[in-house]
Amino acid sequence: MDWDLFLKIVDDISSYNPNAFIQLFFVGEPLLHARILDMIRYLKQNNLRVHLATNATILDETMAHGLINAGLDHITFSFEGTDKETYESIRINAKYESVLENIFRFLRIKGQEKAHIHTVIEIIEMAAIKDKIPDFIKKFDGLPVDQIRIKTFLGWAGTVDESKMAVKTYGTPNYPCNRPWRMLAITWDGLFLPCCVDAGRKYVMGDAHRDSVEDIWNGEKIQYIRKKLNTGNYSEIELCKNCNDIEALSERFTFPEINADHAGST
């Protein structure tokens, strides 16, 4: 993302919602950005909470110290596979032992510096590794990990075939997905999307170069999605009809209260 665009977006968010929780990643590896530490520092200067998710392939000692010293609040390590064979078949050109050591080193530094960074290890539950997960979790015994999360395979709104990899779940949720009530996604080039699952940009709602967060948050396009989800009409939204990542209502990440006209109430 262009630096000036980043500054505009952050200033816009901090003005509209000073309690926002910023997830500084979207369909890419955030540590590849040359100014990632500057981004975190600027967000913290604006008193915003910052979460970063990384695959840790390039997380060296210098970057580990940098993330901690920049004031990062939350970090999630995405690890695809519990053993060398599975991991390296998915994360091409990455080395299982090296990436694990990157994570272990970060955790050791976190402990040494007594850093208050909420730390999550995230594993996708796949049929091939389901029985190996307990042994993998034991690798983190004694290290300052706050949570080890086993995630359902995400089909990215129907764009990825999960049939050969995922542990199957069945049924239709009896609650509306909460994402359009608690978040917006912004692409590297400034496009507003209703949620982070829209990697294919199926439902562009505006452009951060010209539109404000407040206008998009209360705009007609996101209102339409909220109303459809609130009545269970997932099939009427192209983005949502094949999504397997529907979430129950949560207050973990919130925007300011939406007034009744914008809430999609029935």
Residue ranges and their predicted role:
Residues 183:
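Short hydrophobic/aromatic beta-strand element in the GNAT-like acyltransferase core
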Residues 6-8, 72, 167-170, 190:
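Short secondary-structure boundary micro-motifs
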Residues 32-33, 60, 83-86, 128-133, ...:
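Short catalytic/ligand-binding loop motif for oxyanion handling, primarily in non-cytosolic enzymes
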Residues 108-118, 138-175, 191-192, 197-250:
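C-terminal accessory region of radical SAM enzymes
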Residues 186-187:
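Short, acidic, Ser/Thr-enriched surface-loop or helix-capping motifs
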Residues 1-140, 146-151:
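Radical SAM/AdoMet-radical enzyme domain recognition
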Residues 1-5, 255-265:
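Short cysteine/histidine-rich metal-coordination sites, predominantly Zn2+-binding motifs
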Residues 178-180:
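Short, small/polar residue-rich loop motifs at catalytic or cofactor-binding pockets
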